[in-house]
Amino acid sequence: MKNFPLLASTALAGVLALGLAACDGVQWGEGDQPESETSQAVEIASETESVGPELGTFGIETADMKPSVDPGDDFYAYVNGTWLDTFEIPAERSSYNSFTRLFERSEERVRKIIEDAAAADAPMGSTEQKIGDYFAAFMDTDAIEEAGLAPIQDELDRYMAAETHDDIVALMLDPSVAARSIVGIGVSIDAKQPDKYSVYIGQSGLGLPDRDYYLSERFADKAVAYQDFLGDLLRFAGVEQATEKAAEVYAFEKALAEAHWSRAERRDRDKTYNRYTLAELEEMAPGLPWASSMETLGADGEEYYIVSTPSAVEETAKIFRDTPVETLKNYLIAGAIRSYSSVLPKEIDDRVFAFTGTELRGVPEQRPRWKRGVSAVNGAMGEAVGKVYVERYFPEDSKRQMDELVKNLREGFAERLENLEWMGDETRKEALAKLDAFTPKIGYPEEWTDYSALEVSADNPVENMRQARIFGFNENWSQLGQPIDKKEWFMTPQTVNAYYSSTRNEIVFPAAILQAPFFDPEADLAVNYGAIGAVIGHEIGHGFDDQGRKSDGTGALRDWWTEEDAARFQEKADALGAQYATYEPVEGFFINPELTMGENIGDLGGLSMAYHAYKRATAGQDVPVIDGFTGDQRFFMAWAQVWKGLYREEALKQQVATDSHSNGKFRVNGVVRNMDPWYEAFDVSEDDELYLPEDERVSIW
């Protein structure tokens, strides 16, 4: 029962979208930008020498557009169609989008940071030594081949030596081994008392991406392939009768899956907050040794524990006790081989990729070793790398400009709240107080993680992984009983993403996302508002989506809505959900409106806020037409450009089934068709496919 960091936060892009990267945009001289637009852009952009926007002549890569498509029929294809028709997803990727492009830039930069650290001949124990040696050990494939399974043999022997169910639990609690957990336990901010940390407990333990992969006929072929995969993992470890043992492990996991809550159910913050005393835990789920487990974790003195999925935990405990120890040992062995595969011999590494990459996501080729090494270092020492990343690659002026943009968006949203017709004064007062209490974090943390306790060597990548796991475990559990670390970040500066934390009531924008197509100081003002402005609005909007609205300005899970206003909100949310339920990204896979509701509300609210802020910023000004596009057109085009992307079919199926975000096409078309200004900007009429009658258009925030 390893720790799992429970983040009460909502990210801009899902994990699947985080293959992100840099764009090779066209640059142009400052004399090419229209004078009136230049004067506007300077208000939010750097006053350093202009070199022109990275993309196109004003921030949009117009060569990617497909003018033959009517914007009212498919706005996403109108803005991105030529790119969608001609771009080929790299063989090493399951998808490719704006995030991927920036991720690749970040990846190259981090590689340079790592190489410089390795070449520095730094003293033992220094950050540079640890960064360089972690990467060097990962890259030494000759040594990895020669070592075989020897580096993990002691761990495998420990699994094989287990004799009782309690022995299995002890292994699951031990961060020095890669034992998979059937129940996740970790420390996070208490959702109802956000001034303290509490222990959270929830369902865990599946080897496939989601419970549906075990239970739905749509994924029956994946279930068969997974059993074959489990058999190979056990064979690598020398387990006899591996095929039969794999079937037993699969049956155990399927039983867990049947007990698990769906992803949509786990979004409900009221239903996932359930306090239990230690005695109540033992009564509810007696199949697990709660008292000794909490003592091992140093959490036995807690007044209560928060269980996110009570029925799943209760059933998991029964399944665990009813499962033979031999099956549980094999479950742990298969999980360990999979966990360490990147630093085990090529035969094992290739087999794991064949299943997790090719079978599950349709990816033809494994990523180059150096890229995987960069990811490994980022995972182990992300903030150490991030500190250097910020020093080298993040202009301080970008932070100032973002501060100004956030200020503009907040002020604009406050105006919208003041004039929101469907909300009563009592709820409005609370909403404005919450907005006023928002904390923005931009670029990088004020304080950096101290990695002095992390031990790293240049010749043992397996041990490096162990030490990184132990370090993360200790970092998490050391927070229990301590004051809230308000300066903590949950993403590194080199991460291309953003998030909102409900328990902290904060919006966070790492440095790496503050690049084109999201943000470009040299781009047209409308483009920046339609891109990063909408991203800012999206994150603010999460504080007021179907789940974020349940927290107040302090971050506490508290119902501050009148019944009437809550009902009006739900009516609007349901109407939006009904629209998204009709969208079918891939045949047979429709968007789940319950799973994606928060993100869909964030997208619609974010773009609406950004448009309002853009009109405030340009009020009374003569906004020019650029390359034939009005300011409003450029604003909406920027939103569409941000979300352009392609998926392999298997990856798209997984995205639709497991991701709380709608895919790019519907993040664009599903939003703009609800906004009156888009209809006016592109002269959309009843004859167009995206047209919605005015009374069917949803406006929440």
Regions found by a protein language model. Give the residues of each.
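Bacterial N-terminal signal peptides that target proteins for export
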Residues: 1-11
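Post-signal peptide N-terminal segment of mature Sec-exported envelope proteins
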Residues: 31-51
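Short, Gly/Pro- and small/polar-rich lid/capping loops
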Residues: 46-63
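Active-site-surrounding "flap" and adjacent substrate/cofactor-binding loops of secreted or lumenal enzymes
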Residues: 51-56, 69-143
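Noncatalytic, helix-rich "gating/capping" subdomain that lines the substrate-entry/channel surface
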Residues: 117-408
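Intrinsically disordered, low-complexity linker/terminal regions across diverse proteins
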Residues: 284-287, 306, 310, 334, ...
